[in-house]
UniProtKB/Swiss-Prot annotation:
Keyword annotations: Isomerase, tRNA processing
EC assignment: 5.4.99.25
Protein name: tRNA pseudouridine synthase B
Encoding gene per record: truB
GO biological processes: mRNA pseudouridine synthesis; tRNA pseudouridine synthesis
HAMAP family in alphabetical order: TruB_bact (MF_01080)
Amino acid sequence: MNDALADSGLVIVDKPQGMTSHDVVSKIRRTFSTKKVGHAGTLDPMATGVLVLGLERGTKFLAHMVASTKSYTATIRLGAATTTDDREGETITSASPDQLAGITETKISDAVKQFRGSIMQRPAAVSAIKIDGKRAHQRVREGEKVEIPARPVTISRYDILEIRRDAAFIDIDVEVDCSSGTYIRSLARDLGEELGVGGHLTALRRTQVGPFTLDNAVTLEKLEENPHVSLTLDQALAASYPVLSVSEKEASDLAMGKWLTPRGLKGIHAAVDPHGRAIALVKEQGKRLATIFVARPSTL
């Protein structure tokens, strides 16, 4: 039996430095000869690492991955603040060698602790956030002064790996686990402000998005040699959410958007039929077990 979703799924790319996330989407469109490609979670051109892309019906699933926890390794440079909060911006303040000499490892460690847990974070002005319909980075380039309100984020891990000193700066390698919407550039900026010497990001690598890690990621060169999805839509749903086994009849009902009798489930589950096919994402809403995303609608 032909599977209507045979070409649908996720491609996990190890994004190279220098490419925008949209550049990667364009490349994948050409590689797979399809226009139906999207990505979950923008990576700046400077950044490398895990970029999750959806193909065909997999693009519809991306909206349900946006809230995934993300992990990063990064290098924060203390001693200078920049217009973009990373190394690609212009320097706006610099600390003196004497100021940097007063920044002990204990002070750095204590400052980092202030940013663990649930915090309010002000996103970087040069970002993809829309303000009155226009991206913040566009407004900055046009000379506007942009101030984006702080928003709640959760930093579940913010660990110092190594501290390296120079007369003109202090580099700190860190590992961060955080909620979606967190800006690592903002963490660098805010750490520098907390210590009174300025700070910005000099390196960033995303190591995980939800359940998908660098072990799942493939380079663009490898994909060009052998185009293939990293996970089928069946595998993607089952990897991202707890599995709920359903009968043929229940699968048919879910495919038509019908609801099932609730079962006391908490959170979102991937409904999988007896053949191992992911039918839908479901969630209990009142007295219904309802679909929030149908992977295999009856119309396919």
